[in-house]
């Protein structure tokens, strides 16, 4: 039913759907105004994105800016669905001893990359790749 949900979690889902805009419009329809949507999907330079043949798309810091009327890409209005992009965070993970070393480095570099996302994504995304990106969105209905 329309306007039914205050919270939706779409973890490792949207990269698989064929009709991305249709799914976003359906999310918008079933969410109440101000509902929080948590989305996780593979980052564009992730080996996990490229390895899985069922992945249709990957995310960047700006993937959901097309739905946010307060952001420059929102002017394209590809869809009537509107969401505020509240936040995004890159995710990296490595197992074992190498993972412990990377975790120390990541404490500094990941927040730096998030603060400088456009430059990072243009110049360094394939040098220092993230695995996924997580977004917090808020449904806008007014």
Sequence positions of predicted segments:
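A short acidic, Gly/Pro-enriched loop at the edge of an enzyme's catalytic core
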Residues: 1-8
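Short catalytic micro-motifs in class I SAM-dependent methyltransferases
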Residues: 9-16
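S-adenosyl-L-methionine-dependent methyltransferase catalytic module, highlighting the catalytic core
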Residues: 18-22, 26-28, 36-142
């Amino acid at each position: 039913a329309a306007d039914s949900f205050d919270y939706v979690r779409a973890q490792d889902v949207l990269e698989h759907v064929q009709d991305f805009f249709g799914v976003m419009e359906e999310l918008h329809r079933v969410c109440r105004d101000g509902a929080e949507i948590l989305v996780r999907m593979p980052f564009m330079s992730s080996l996990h994105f490229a390895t899985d043949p069922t992945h249709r798309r990957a995310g960047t810091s700006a993937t959901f800016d097309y739905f946010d009327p307060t952001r420059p890409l929102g002017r394209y209005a590809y869809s009537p669905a509107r969401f505020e992009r509240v936040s995004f965070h890159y995710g990296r993970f490595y197992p074992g001893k190498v993972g412990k070393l990377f975790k120390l480095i990541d404490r500094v570099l990941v927040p730096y990359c998030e603060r400088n996302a456009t430059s990072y994504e243009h110049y360094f995304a394939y040098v220092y790749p993230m695995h996924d990106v997580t977004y917090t969105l808020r449904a806008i209905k007014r």
